[in-house]
Amino acid sequence: MTAGTVVITGGILATVILLCIIAVLCYCRLQYYCCKKGTDGEDAEEEEEEEEHGLSIHPRVPACNACSSHVLDGRGGLAPLTSESCSQPCGVASHCTTCSPYRTPFYIRTADMVPNGGGGERLSFAPTHYKEGGTPSLKLAAPQNYPVTWPSSGHEAFTNPRAISTDV
């Protein structure tokens, strides 16, 4: 390959990459404008005038949607799960129960909100096998084609009959 071929190939490759980036950005912008709810030409002009004058006739805080947090959690569809409506916007400190931001996977919980209290208390762990009690009665179906074999009986794995408490 000559130097000219390398330069031309590199230029074509850079152009293709830039065109792909521009196409993705245009697609994202198109999705943003197409999926924007409740805004048509007249509303957009009114909002631009309000922004210029610093006035707002209607509040910009979105209304509470009872199904939004359940959709983010993967627990629901687009229909509200409860019939009660939320009287407050979602951003206030005293949140409503139907659209609580505390249920979403994107909310970072502080130490006082964690069930363990932020690691201040000890959690106990009880082994599944006790010397005096034997194995617990779990009714599990064994695979029929592939039997499970263990290299040892497993009794030496759990020898402590007491609950084990560790720092979390």
From Swiss-Prot:
Localization, UniProt: Membrane
Transmembrane portions of the chain: 6-26
Keyword Zinc-finger attributed: no
Record's protein name: Protein FAM163A
Pfam families for this protein: FAM163
Organism phylogeny: Eukaryota, Metazoa, Chordata, Craniata, Vertebrata
InterPro entries: FAM163 (IPR029379), FAM163A (IPR040281)
One GO CC annotation: membrane
Topology term for the membrane: Single-pass membrane protein
Keywords recorded for this protein, A-Z: Membrane, Transmembrane, Transmembrane helix
Main location: membrane
Family: Belongs to the FAM163 family.
